[in-house]
Amino acid sequence: MNNKSTIIKNDKNLVFIMAGLMVGLLVAALDNSIIGTAMPRIISNLQGMEYYVWPFTSYMLSSTIAIILFGKLSDIYGRKNILILGIVIFVIGSIMCGFSTNMIELILFRGIQGIGGGILIALPFIVVGEIFSPRDRGKYMGILASVFGVSSVLGPILGGIITDTVGWRWIFFVNVPIGIIAIGMLMNSLPDLKLGGVKKVIDYSGIITFTLALSGFFLGLTLAQDLNAYPLVEIIGLFIFSAIMFVLFIWAEKKAVEPILPLYLFKNSTFTISSIENFLATALIFSGIIYVPLFAQGVLGMSATNSGLIMIPMLISLTISANIAGQIISRTGKYKKLAIAEFLITGAGVILLATMNADTSPYELLAYSTILGLGSGIMYTVFTISVQNAFSNREIGITTAAMQFFRNVGATVAIPIFGYIMNYSMSSSAAVNLSQKEILTLSIQNIFMATIILAFAGLIIAFFLKETSLNDDEQINEEIIGELSDKAK
């Protein structure tokens, strides 16, 4: 049958499109993992252990805001233009990070880098949702998700090796050639996809209130990690400010002609449940990405390189499970059981990680983190596909961006909360005359104990996910077909 999805699926140019999307995604995804193993050395060089989580937080905050904003702007100005812009911003931010002379500069420059990273994380999944039928999306979502696994494998290794050899600054400079390659591939392969019928109206009120609401909230969370360093009244003030901006944001979205985040989406139970599950699942995987290397170096005494190597099995398992989940969805058209399996497996992983102590062997740490990765990979395909299937093609852009948004929110909220748990645990443990290694061990144990609660909540919620069979065919944007066909000639 010569239907629309078959025309797209057989287009030879799709090979180059997927390659370009994967490299673009790689340049952002690599940065999430490469900095983890380098952070102890960065802190040692620039000073400021109290700022340990801030480079993560600033990056995640700016990328979280960028996902929604530029996901919507790509409806107006085209996916290709926004993708290229994202790479340029990311590369510039990387260069600035590499030249940082203190932690404050690094935190600020990571924020710039995060804007580009947010664009590059969201747009590839939107494009795949547009050019493939629901049944085929599983395979290609799995392929894109594997980029996170590959980058996560390469990231810790590169982060450790680069840090131990030429220095931590080069973990940022390495993004420059990758970014240039990504621009070249996307310029020559990706058509300028635009959503027809969208009014060229920018929701400035929504953008401003959205940015201020998130910034106030996340800044308050971050400052709350150390109540001794920051006045409580300032922290409370930030949360109040955030709440006011959030109310104004809701009001602005109700009035907007083209809202950046349409509120009616939340009336769909699949969208709401998938958003919550993305939030929880991302918090779980980030607990491993951040604190497994710290445990390996600080408790087990491993080098930056070896702490990166011990992360490889976890991230390979993430890649494998993402692809397997995508294949299962493509063949069966079902995804609910996979959502349940996601939290059963990740729950087992964090329970085991919570048992770690100074006597834990590197092989045990490797096994525990691998289980966490095996469950986490399922997230990248299941919840994006469930939401794309619950809405029309016209809404794929914003709904897909929203799923990436809630993943980033999960990480951005979890990172400072984990930091608060660590700081509180370290200060409490210091009062009972424990050694530094014992204090660090107990602090990391407490973090993983907290993630057990998140895994249990995710498991319960997964049972309420509505499952709708995926179709083999779907009406695909005629403009997309035309552009792909022209490029294939």
Predicted regions: what is each one?
Residues 57-72, 121-125, 312-325:
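Central cavity-lining transmembrane alpha-helices of secondary-active solute carriers
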Residues 176-195, 211-223, 241-256, 458-466:
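C-terminal membrane-cytosol helix-exit motif in multi-pass small-molecule transporters
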